[in-house]
Amino acid sequence: MLAARTTGPQRCATIQERARATDWERALDSTASIVICVAAVAALLVAERRNSQVGKWFTKPVASAAFIAVAAISGALDSDYGRLILLGLGLCLLGDVLLIPEGRLAVFRAGVFAFLAGHVAFAAAFLTQPRSLPWLAVAAVTLVLALSGVWRWLSPRLPVDMRRPVQSYFLVIGVMTALACAVSGAGGPPIIAAGAIAFTASDIAVARDRFVHQEFANRAWGLPLYYLALVLLALSPSVISRG
């Protein structure tokens, strides 16, 4: 009888120890994936500086695959929220690959649509979480003003056949970012809003590089900000699952 009484607490302690060990393993694996992402982004910047297409093909897919790994390690497959985030990240990886070739407008347009679909997936993920209406309203107004200003600056420089896709992209990324802010405002992890805002800001660098003035400076700040954004979103399933 005494053995039976002590077995229960001992089993609970063993389960807790195993859970802690699993958490440590996930943290180490996630950290390793983030380090790989950082290293690949650094190498990508070197390739961009040297305008090496071979370097871009070697480094960009690795950097993007790393944020997929971060999401998987963070438990993205364990919830509807996580699975939608993982879907969005996968579409972003596809967009990253499609944006590597230069001077091919059709491929670039396909990349834009891949990112557009990715933002829809992120927005759907945020709709699975509680949201703050006041935060949603403030974020929406702020984003309308900011993106309208960017549109006025960018639209005269766009090819005619790209104006409608870019307008649609602005609309979707604005909705996605507003929803992210609403989730964080309702008590959700701040990294959700931070990731969405960083993503939106990084797209300005892409737009300037593609349609206004192509120079390394755009990529020097836009690429690190973009990968930071997606790593933050990739980490969010682990925080959501604990909340």
Regions found by a protein language model. Give the residues of each.
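Polytopic alpha-helical membrane-helix bundles and their juxtamembrane interface segments
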Residues: E25-G243
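P-loop/Walker A NTP-binding region and its immediately flanking N-terminal helices
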Residues: A19
